[in-house]
Amino acid sequence: MTLKQKWDVYSRLTRIDRPIGTLLLLWPCLMALMLAAGGMPDLKVLVIFIIGVVIMRACGCIINDYADRDLDSFVERTRSRPLASGEISTKEALILFVILGLSAFGLVLLLNGLVVKLSVVGIILTIIYPFTKRITNMPQMFLGIVWSWSIPMAYAAQTGEVPMEAWWLFAANWCWTVAYDTMYAMVDRDDDLKVGIKSTAILFGKYDRQIIGLFQLAALACFIAAGWSADRGLLYGLGILTFVGFSTYQQMLIFDRERAPCFKAFLNNNWAGLALFVGLGADYLI
């Protein structure tokens, strides 16, 4: 295998070629840093968290593909993944996971002790998540915890503590993650039923759209509460309204439960997250 071919395999394994997951992780993390700092976060902390998000998203993809390597070949969307197709060995994938994980932990060691402790929990959660799809119909709810863990870490890094304000943002992101990852799971639902992978898309059944809507409303309420507790103003409110607009559009996309529109709805959440981030940033700047 040439160096170019190896890079192609690694980029697909870590999803560097598909940044949507990194962006969905990044927006709430950046919001947490801004809220914790009351505006512009410490530059060192900001750089560490941005790099950390990229690395840990890659780690999550590797361990997810490792856990699903025997099932991915039966699912239309995942059968070409490097581990499922045999392009890379499990040993090589795990070595890469360890290298990236240690790199992320090395960055965390540059921060305070509370962040280090929280990061250990975060790594454990990241490793556990892929295996929850075997034992529970609600892996998206566990993913919501994993996907939101950077929020208390961001507050701890910036302030040395995790106040109630952080948990409002955590709850908002948890609800939002369950909503958009259920949309994602709707894409694979037929294949997942055949191979025994569990998901909230299967659990919610014919009420999937309605329950996604409830999670979107709960996320909205918690995002408002987080902004209220931080005394945010009109421009953050405009970001919230834009988030509502995108959420409404997503409901329209998933109405017929077809694969392509459901995937489009999932991808659209990047813009919803960006709207919240821009609204919050503008509220601090103007």
Swiss-Prot record:
Major location (coarse): membrane
Pathway(s) of this molecule: Cofactor biosynthesis; ubiquinone biosynthesis
InterPro entries named among the record's database cross-references: HB_polyprenyltransferase-like (IPR006370), Prenyltransferase (IPR039653), UbiA_prenyltransferase (IPR000537), UbiA_prenylTrfase_CS (IPR030470), UbiA_sf (IPR044878)
Cofactor dependence: Mg(2+)
Gene Ontology cellular component list: plasma membrane
Keywords, sorted A to Z: Cell inner membrane, Cell membrane, Magnesium, Membrane, Transferase, Transmembrane, Transmembrane helix, Ubiquinone biosynthesis
GO biological processes: ubiquinone biosynthetic process
Catalytic activities: all-trans-octaprenyl diphosphate + 4-hydroxybenzoate = 4-hydroxy-3-(all-trans-octaprenyl)benzoate + diphosphate
Recorded topology in the membrane: Multi-pass membrane protein
PROSITE patterns tied to this protein: UBIA
One Gene Ontology MF term: 4-hydroxybenzoate polyprenyltransferase activity
Homology family: Belongs to the UbiA prenyltransferase family.
Function: Catalyzes the prenylation of para-hydroxybenzoate (PHB) with an all-trans polyprenyl group. Mediates the second step in the final reaction sequence of ubiquinone-8 (UQ-8) biosynthesis, which is the condensation of the polyisoprenoid side chain with PHB, generating the first membrane-bound Q intermediate 3-octaprenyl-4-hydroxybenzoate.
Protein name: 4-hydroxybenzoate octaprenyltransferase
Species this chain originates from: Shewanella baltica (strain OS185)
Gene name, Swiss-Prot/TrEMBL: ubiA
